[in-house]
A protein has these predicted regions:
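Alpha-helical transmembrane segments used as membrane anchors
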Residues: 1-167
Length: 167
């Protein structure tokens, strides 16, 4: 006997397609970040060999997320895109994913900012901190250090981390 197959409505098909596409984008971003090469810039010149597995689009994604945004903590963004894609595809409850997204992104931002503060304080050159933590993080750490000093910045970030974990 052949089991009857349930016909999917257009809305269900659209949701599944959106979920799959979101997961594909998440994996694309993840592979772009994993294969990030710090020396690759956003120029497309003939004859230049690129190292990013995802080509020129991967270079652009890794440039924006690594160099301009939050460095290695950008990997969390790629994972969150995949999680959102799965949630959409599997028609799971969105509320826990919102909470997970907020916690994950906040923890990664606080963590990379702590890294930037400690690395800068320990004498690591700004270009090295920039290479690992990104431009946004470098500016956040500079702002915190200018207004609060190193100990004050550590205290504020530590308190924020404790409040975040306790919530």
């Amino acid at each position: 006997m052949v089991a009857k197959q349930k016909k999917l409505s257009l809305e269900e098909k659209s949701r599944e397609i959106l979920g799959i596409l979101t997961m594909v984008v998440g994996f694309f971003v993840l592979l772009s970040l994993v294969s990030h090469e710090p020396t690759e810039e956003l120029s497309i010149m003939p004859g230049v060999h690129f190292h990013n597995w995802m080509g020129y689009i991967g270079i652009f994604i890794s440039y924006v997320l690594f160099k301009m945004f939050i460095g290695w903590a950008s990997l969390v963004i790629a994972v969150l895109i995949v999680v959102w894609g799965y949630t959409i595809f599997a028609e799971k409850d969105i509320q826990p994913v919102f909470r997970f997204t907020g916690y994950s992104f906040s923890l990664s931002l606080i963590g990379i900012t702590l890294f930037g503060l400690i690395a800068g304080q320990s004498g690591m050159p700004n270009d090295e901190v920039f290479r690992h933590a990104g431009y946004l993080t470098l500016n956040i750490t500079k702002l915190l250090k200018d207004f609060l000093g190193f100990p004050g910045s550590i205290m504020v970030l530590g308190a924020t981390l404790i409040v975040l974990v306790q919530a």
